[in-house]
């Protein structure tokens, strides 16, 4: 059994006086402008990738050791970091597979990887260039050595791809 709340006539008339000037709401839904937000994020990501591509020049070739495994260490970074990369002390949190890509596509993907690592605070990444015709294997170390956010890199240990991959140590600007 439910009780009905009955209001006396005075309460009803007071309520009607209180809402006398009120109008019905035409629309009470909220429209989110998510397409604009997504579009801005995509534009920002494209711009960051293009800016990162600026660091990769095909004309400039830094002096890298041609003997033994490919390795590089920026002047302000301890060589102990390269040793830790070689031994596999750093575990890559992000992997990039460049098999089957052209040089331009690989350059763009490499720039995007470095930006993604910086945004997500990832310190070590693995770039797999494969064996193939050795074009990417020769170009990737030259591009990485030019980027200011790359602290060091070394040929990956067997666990992470051996001579078909490179472990990259990326600087985190906090």
From Swiss-Prot:
Pfam families (UniProt xref): Smr
EC number: 3.1.-.-
GO BP: rescue of stalled ribosome
One GO molecular-function entry: rRNA binding
Claim: Hydrolase is one of the keywords in the record: yes
InterPro entries: Smr_dom, Smr_dom_sf, SmrB-like
Keywords associated with the record: Endonuclease, Hydrolase, Nuclease, RNA-binding, rRNA-binding
SUPFAM superfamilies: SMR domain-like (SSF160443)
Superkingdom: Bacteria
Domain Smr intervals: 96-171
PANTHER family noted in UniProt: DNA ENDONUCLEASE SMRA-RELATED, UPF0115 PROTEIN YFCN
Its job: Acts as a ribosome collision sensor. Detects stalled/collided disomes (pairs of ribosomes where the leading ribosome is stalled and a second ribosome has collided with it) and endonucleolytically cleaves mRNA at the 5' boundary of the stalled ribosome. Stalled/collided disomes form a new interface (primarily via the 30S subunits) that binds SmrB. Cleaved mRNA becomes available for tmRNA ligation, leading to ribosomal subunit dissociation and rescue of stalled ribosomes.
Family of the protein in this entry: Belongs to the SmrB family.
Subunit structure as annotated in this protein's UniProt entry: Associates with collided ribosomes, but not with correctly translating polysomes.
Protein name: Ribosome rescue factor SmrB
Protein encoded by which gene: smrB
């Amino acid at each position: 059994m439910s009780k009905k709340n009955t209001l006396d006539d005075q309460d009803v008339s007071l309520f009607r006086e209180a809402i006398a000037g009120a109008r019905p709401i035409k629309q009470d839904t909220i429209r989110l402008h998510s397409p604009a937000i997504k579009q801005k994020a995509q534009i920002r990501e494209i711009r960051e990738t293009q800016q990162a591509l600026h660091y990769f020049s095909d004309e400039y070739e830094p002096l890298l050791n041609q003997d033994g495994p490919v390795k590089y260490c920026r002047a302000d970074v301890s060589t102990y970091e390269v040793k830790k990369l070689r031994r596999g002390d750093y575990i890559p949190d992000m992997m990039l597979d460049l098999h089957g890509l052209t040089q331009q596509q690989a350059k763009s993907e490499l720039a995007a990887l470095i930006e993604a690592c910086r945004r997500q605070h990832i310190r070590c990444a693995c770039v797999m260039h494969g064996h193939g015709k050795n074009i990417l294997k020769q170009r990737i170390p030259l591009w990485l050595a030019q980027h200011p956010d790359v602290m060091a890199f070394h040929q990956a240990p067997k666990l992470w791809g051996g001579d078909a991959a490179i472990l990259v140590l990326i600087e985190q600007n906090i």
